[in-house]
Design a protein with these regions (language model features):
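Helix-to-loop junction immediately C-terminal to a conserved catalytic motif
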Residues: 21-53
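Glycine-rich anion/phosphate-binding loops
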Residues: 106-114
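Short beta-alpha junction loops
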Residues: 76-79, 134, 167-172
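Short glycine-rich anion-binding loops that position phosphate/pyrophosphate groups of nucleotides
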Residues: 52-53, 133-136
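Short hydrophobic helices that act as membrane-entry/anchoring signals
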Residues: 3, 7-29, 84, 88-92
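A cross-family acyltransferase "interaction/gating" segment
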Residues: 138-212
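Residue-level preference for the first positions of well-ordered beta-strands
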Residues: 44-46, 125-131, 162-164
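Catalytic core of membrane glycerolipid acyltransferases/transacylases, capturing the structured
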Residues: 41-107
């Protein structure tokens, strides 16, 4: 029954939600996105993104919605927060973690279930948005702790999975802020904040590496600055 509702009513609600979100962000952010067209011809892609602010998930999902169906991953507690049920349901979000209070065996079983869902989504040709750092950046450099093995586990199980790196600039607390003149007709000098989104294929991640070395390499890639050279 849930699948039937999602396939019919959910499709319309999803489209309406993302149109509203995209319109909202267009009022406050002037976003440029490079490489978005590459995603359209690459089904079943794992998108690894920097996590610079709480706006990342909805902004990315809304901007890429018309290009490819994106299933965002979210924290367990965020997913099961009753106040966020509707957007989580409409966006078909995937809860990636589990409460630390759970026994180890229960957490391992939960992780296996989540990884199975991710692989099923990718096999259907949909893309999965994942933030390797696991939380919003609280310092200038993106950190990918060695104990977060989700990306490593996904690619080790399916090494041929297409991977794309998504970096955001201008949106986070520790990034430079620049504004356009969108609101000057109202006498407001500070307009929309300029945000750069860069999406490119990633072919040099080796899942055969130990998870510590793998995460260190991924961390370096996430922290590479976006080139704005013409």
């Amino acid at each position: 029954m849930i699948r039937f509702v999602d396939a019919n009513l959910g499709r319309w609600l999803r489209h309406l939600l993302f149109v509203l979100i995209r319109s909202y962000y267009a009022l406050f952010f002037n976003v440029s996105c490079s490489g978005k067209h590459l995603l359209q011809d690459q089904p079943g892609t794992l998108i690894l993104a920097t996590h610079v602010s709480r706006h990342d998930g909805p902004l990315i999902a809304a901007l890429l919605y018309s290009t490819k169906r994106i299933r965002p991953t979210v924290h367990y507690h965020e997913y099961y927060n009753w106040s966020q049920f509707l957007p989580m349901f409409i966006a078909s979000a995937i809860p990636m973690s589990s409460p630390k209070s759970w026994p180890d065996e229960k957490r391992k079983a939960r992780k296996a279930v989540v990884l199975k869902i991710v692989h099923k989504v990718l096999a259907k040709g949909n893309s999965v948005l994942l933030f390797p750092a696991g939380k919003v950046r609280r310092e200038e450099r993106e950190k990918v702790p060695a104990y977060l093995s989700g990306v490593h586990d996904i690619l080790r199980a399916e090494p041929e999975t297409p991977v794309m790196l998504l970096r955001l600039d201008g949106l986070g607390k520790f990034q430079d802020a620049a504004y356009d003149s969108f609101w000057t007709f109202l006498g407001i000098k500070k307009g929309r904040r300029h945000v750069a989104m860069d999406l490119r294929p990633l072919r040099d991640l080796d899942p055969s590496m130990a998870v510590e070395a793998f995460n260190a390499r991924l961390e370096d890639l996430l922290n590479e600055p976006i080139s704005h050279e013409l």
